[in-house]
């Protein structure tokens, strides 16, 4: 069964997602899927083997995808970047936690087996979820975004241009923008992660370069492992990575 979920998050923001539950089961595990930047969630296929053994909550954070009708931000990445209190990702990170609240509130969910997964922006959200909320039992990010902004500015064409452009727009030094970004940098969350992690990396990724993936990963002190795909960029071979992820979560079922 698939449900269309609408709920309120931090500062009264409306967010939506899809909640798929296994038929005829109780006390089932659940995985939260965090989406990439602006990516539209797919409707979960309840006929897959994965959906038969665990529930899935696919969530769109504020203003993105399922929530575009509520979008007041314009460009999400740069919105409110002048201050940590107004920056878009302050609210988006709270939406990440709100998704956990929803899953945890479901009576039929095994509260000890809630997992997180996602790629790019969703990979960053996965790591944030694991760092900020010990209700997550294990996480599987791939090609994670939002990590090591000092080097991102040099390595990431789009990110570098956005950061420099915002500094010019605000007529401030780039260091001022990077100071704001430090509050949302995955590097500064990684040390708080206590659950097991598996990470997938595309060695040819120019959007979220491998260097930035590992800058956060290397600071994780909990059990961790990674898989490198030498020929892939910002997308991994789906069947291969999904199998890695499935096998990883199976260890905790």
Please place each PLM-identified region on the residue numbering.
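Short beta-strand element of the alpha/beta-hydrolase
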Residues: 17-21, 27-38
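Gly/Ser-rich "nucleophile elbow"/oxyanion-hole loop immediately N-terminal to the catalytic nucleophile
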Residues: 77-120
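Cap/lid segment of the alpha/beta-hydrolase catalytic domain
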Residues: 42-94, 151-160
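N-terminal cap/lid segment of alpha/beta-hydrolase-fold proteins
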Residues: 1-25
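Hydrolase active-site cap/lid region
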Residues: 123, 127-173, 228
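Short beta-strand/loop motif that positions the catalytic acidic residue
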Residues: 192-193, 199-201, 205
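Histidine-bearing beta->alpha loop at or near hydrolase active sites
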Residues: 226-244, 248
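Acidic catalytic loop of the alpha/beta-hydrolase fold
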Residues: 203-208, 235
């Amino acid at each position: 069964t698939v449900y269309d979920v609408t709920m309120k998050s931090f500062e009264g923001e409306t967010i939506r997602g899809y909640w798929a539950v296994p038929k005829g089961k109780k006390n089932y595990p659940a995985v939260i899927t965090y989406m990439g930047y602006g990516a539209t969630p797919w409707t979960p296929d309840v006929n897959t083997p994965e959906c038969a053994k665990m529930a899935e909550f696919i969530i769109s954070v504020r203003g993105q995808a399922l929530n575009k009708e509520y979008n007041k931000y314009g460009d999400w990445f740069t919105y409110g970047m002048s201050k940590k209190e107004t920056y878009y990702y302050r609210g988006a990170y709270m939406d990440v936690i709100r998704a956990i609240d929803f899953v945890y509130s479901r009576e039929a969910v095994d509260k000890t087996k809630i997992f997180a997964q996602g790629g790019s922006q969703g990979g960053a959200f996965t790591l944030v979820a694991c760092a900020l909320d010990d209700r997550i039992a294990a996480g599987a990010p791939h090609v994670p975004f939002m990590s090591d902004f000092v080097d991102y500015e040099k390595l990431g064409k789009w990110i570098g241009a956005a950061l420099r452009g915002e500094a010019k727009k605000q007529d401030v030094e780039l260091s001022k923008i990077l100071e704001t970004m430090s509050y949302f940098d995955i590097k500064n969350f990684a040390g708080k992660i206590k659950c097991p992690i598996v990470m997938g990396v595309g060695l040819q990724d120019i959007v979220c370069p491998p260097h930035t993936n590992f800058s956060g990963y290397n600071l994780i002190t909990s059990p961790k492992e990674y898989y490198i795909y030498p020929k892939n960029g910002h997308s991994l071979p789906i069947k291969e990575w999904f199998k890695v992820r499935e096998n990883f979560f199976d260890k905790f079922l």
